Amino acid sequence: MNNIVKVTRLFDLLERLQVNYPKEDILAGKVQGVWRKYSSREYVEISHDYAYGFLEYGLQQQDKVITVMNNRPEWNFVDMGTALAGMVHVPVYSTLSEDDYRYIIPHSDAKIIIIGSALLYKHLAPVIASLKNPPAVFTVDPVEGANNLDQIVTIGRDNKEKWASVIEENKKNITPDTLLTIIYTSGATGTPKGVMHAHSSIVFNFLAHAAQQCKNSSHRYLSFLPLCLIYERTMNYEFQSLGISIYYAENMGTIARDLKDIQADGFCAVPRVIEMMYKKLEDAG
């Protein structure tokens, strides 16, 4: 493709999608059993709304935002919104112990924690409440008594004129060496450790692998490995860089159904997942 938009910072992917891969289903997730698809244009606009909203809420450059959620389009909106605003996304596994969360949240110095579901909120709320300086809490799904992430989107849209020029300046001034994310280990081998990654670290990896990718913008992938896992996260960006549609599985138990439903051209997996699939096929005869 001629005139492909160059990517050196994560948020450059948004311009590439809008210019080179304007499609109607770049991201999709299940909402009440129905696929909710997001176009390239929507992805760009919503990500900017998140950036405006974070700034209007009072966050500043290099402030940390934690997410604890399963794979869904909203993960990407937060991811790109924080990148555009010059903040640091800290995605955390949704399966950690209370002690791990009790360590990671203050250690990361997060100003906001975004929780995906009511079930996760129920698990995390007591932990957060026990902290000396707890971050503000928002949920993606509606949860009684909790702030909803839509509030951030709304104040972002309402204050676009106030913050649009700030974001445009960020696009000029944020360099590939700017801190983008902190990725914590799963804690399986001891206390979770936070690994700091600049834009360049992440971008180099997904562009290098994308050069070997045989699929293109006519294809769609199913995503189910946690996006806080660097492998899945890297592939998530790689697919976006090539305009490949990404559909997020409802949960680990719906993989087979979702693969069939969207007629997926592929997915990323680890040996354990392949072993589970093989056993199911074997048991089915």
Give the location of each predicted region.
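Structural core segment of the AMP-binding/adenylate-forming
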Residues: 15, 57, 84-155
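Conserved AMP-binding A3 loop
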Residues: 37-41, 180-206
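A short helix-loop-beta submotif of the ANL/AMP-binding
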Residues: 64, 70-90, 94-98, 106-112, ...
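Conserved AMP-binding/adenylation subdomain of ANL enzymes
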Residues: 203-220, 227-285
